[in-house]
């Protein structure tokens, strides 16, 4: 599962489970969607398959506001650097600030360096307010789950409040 899909699945999960009523803001690096003429992630097909309808008039541009059919909250997709991959305002006033990474369930073992990179991005990407919930979101693989369980028990991860979201291809999310 690529990074753009992880980002969108996390946003959809929070909306479908009524965990937010606010617009969910996501930032997707254009290179994760397309480089030159090579499409890496067909964002239009994904949105169509998952009930996301573009709300603005520019249907050729993947950035913009999308409605998730049957839900109050929308997803606003941009490609703005330095704002985190997913920002979700929760009803209690806290804000999830998530860094997302790709992953495959294979023997290459990308999870360790990618999850460490996401933690580093959280630590250096923005100032956390008292209501910021820093989160690492990755595909739910055996290795990612093992690392999330182990790292979520570390005193320094607890002190900072980093949460882990393990994203499944069926759209389910395990929060640790």
Residue spans of the language-model regions?
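Acidic-basic catalytic patches of nuclease active cores, encompassing PD-(D/E)XK
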Residues: 1-83, 89-92
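A short acidic, often aromatic-flanked loop/helix-cap motif at beta-alpha or helix-coil junctions
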Residues: 31-34, 167-175
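Active-site-adjacent loop/helix micro-motif of nuclease/hydrolase catalytic cores
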Residues: 105-119, 144-148
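Conserved catalytic cores of phosphodiester-cleaving nucleases, focusing on short active-site segments
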Residues: 86-107, 125
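Surface-exposed cleft-lining segments at the edges of enzyme active sites
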Residues: 70-74, 103-110
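Flexible, glycine-rich phosphate/dinucleotide-binding loops
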Residues: 95, 106, 143-144, 173
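Nucleic-acid nuclease catalytic cores
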Residues: 126-171
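Histidine-anchored nucleotide/phosphate-binding helix
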Residues: 117-127
